[in-house]
Regions:
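Extracellular "leader-to-stem" segments immediately downstream of a signal peptide or signal-anchor
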Residues: 1-77, 355-356, 360-371
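Right-handed parallel beta-helix
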Residues: 2-5, 127-138, 159-172, 188-204, ...
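Right-handed parallel beta-helix/beta-spiral solenoid domain characteristic of secreted/periplasmic
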Residues: 10-12, 96-150, 338-339, 345
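N-terminal extracellular ligand-recognition/capping segment immediately after the signal peptide
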Residues: 60-67, 74-98, 102-117
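Extracellular beta-strand solenoid repeats
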Residues: 79, 86, 92, 100, ...
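Extracellular beta-strand/beta-solenoid scaffold signature
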Residues: 111-122, 142-156, 174-186, 201-221, ...
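C-terminal accessory segments
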Residues: 331-371
Length: 371
């Protein structure tokens, strides 16, 4: 037993070994090893992230928006001038894109006039969408199909996505199966941000991330922010978020809802303005409920004792009660103040400056939509 080499600490020796400093082994490149392995019919490729160009694409009324989106490069910005944009099929988002109005004060109007029911916008694998100051209108054209949703997801996604909706309007959708913004079953958003938006005259839900009903800890969006949004005359639920089961391997969703206004929403029996099932971390604050959830609830919260939930500084005027599972969710004082709005006839539900709600920082913030 001889001719062996070993690297030992000083003052140590081993019979049969020669002590010397050894070189670290040179391991082969793992990519080089793997590139020729696997089934012969499988093309072994590693997807490279696409560079974001931020190139602008201008669209005019009557333009085929689906075609512009198809041809746009990842990171592209599609700019719509004022006018009406009829679409016959969903705008398919499978890359990072921004769709925005050229002028926030004059929102472009998107209408669905396809022969077959579809979403107005569908987010698919690879999709990251920012959409700003666009109005989605559900007025039905004779002989045309109804839209299924304003913004929704493909049914066969395997990748997470992100969505930001800022300054948009969703209006005049009279079918109960319509959802303004919806996450479908087996889809997952890393983040969803909905702010400065206006939802009115909807028969279905405004914001629905409640498709996972198997009660095994799954949910449709991880990090959700709903801020400074106005809801008026909704038959469905303004906000519906569901995470069922008690699987401790899933830690979300994390939900923040603040400075929102609900007027004449979900006044059906056993209805809820907000239906929040199983959020792990939840903050609802500075919201105003006006003639909403009258024969049901303003907030229906199903939470466990260990979940971090907080409902604070809200106003309930002629509205339903808050229903919670534990006694820890409602913190601080709730108010019963008749709201005074800047111009409710023009759908501006911002509190009048100097009013009680404005002083308490309850309801919509300044410069809320619509103007």
């Amino acid at each position: 037993f001889k001719g062996n080499k070993v690297q030992l600490a000083k003052n140590y020796s081993a019979p049969g070994f020669t002590t010397e400093k050894l070189k670290a082994p040179q391991l082969p490149d793992q990519a080089a090893i793997r590139k020729d392995k696997g089934a012969s019919w499988f093309e072994n490729r590693v997807a490279q992230p696409s560079a974001k160009t931020h190139k602008e694409y201008n669209a005019a009324p009557g333009t085929d928006l689906s075609e512009i989106i198809r041809s746009a490069e990842p990171g592209g910005i599609i700019v719509l001038v004022e006018g009406t944009y009829p679409i016959q099929s969903a705008m398919f988002i499978d890359k990072p894109l921004t769709i925005r109005a050229a002028n926030a004060a004059n929102k472009p109007l998107v209408r669905f006039n396809g022969e077959k029911s579809d979403n107005m916008v569908t987010i698919a694998d690879g999709g990251e969408l920012i959409i700003e100051n666009i109005a989605f209108d559900g007025v039905l054209e004779p002989g045309k199909a109804l839209a299924k949703a304003g913004i929704s997801t493909a049914t066969d996604m395997i990748q997470p996505y992100t969505l930001t909706v800022d300054g948009c309007e969703f209006q005049n959708f009279g079918e109960g199966g319509f959802f303004a913004i919806k996450g479908t079953k087996a889809t997952f958003a890393k983040s969803v941000t909905i702010k400065n938006c206006f939802f009115r005259d909807l028969s279905g839900d405004a914001i629905n991330y409640a498709a996972e009903k198997d009660d095994i800890g799954r949910y449709n969006a991880d990090d959700m922010l709903i801020e400074n949004c106005s809801f008026y005359r909704l038959l469905g639920l303004p906000i519906n978020i569901y995470r069922g089961g008690s699987d401790e391997s899933t830690a979300g969703p994390y939900i923040t809802i603040r400075h929102c206004n609900f007027a004449d929403c979900c006044n059906k029996e056993r209805g809820s303005v907000m239906r929040l099932i199983g959020p792990q971390v939840l903050t609802v604050e500075n919201c105003n409920f006006d003639n909403s959830g009258r024969v049901g609830a303003t907030i229906r919260l199903d939470e466990a004792t260990w979940e971090k939930v907080r409902i604070a500084n809200c106003n309930l005027w002629n509205s339903g009660r808050m229903v919670t599972t534990t006694s820890q969710a409602i913190q601080g004082k709730m108010y019963n103040i008749r709201p005074a709005y800047i111009n409710a006839d023009a759908y501006n539900y911002t509190p009048v400056p100097g009013s009680e709600l404005e002083k308490l920082s309850i309801g919509l913030k300044k410069n809320s939509l619509p103007q």
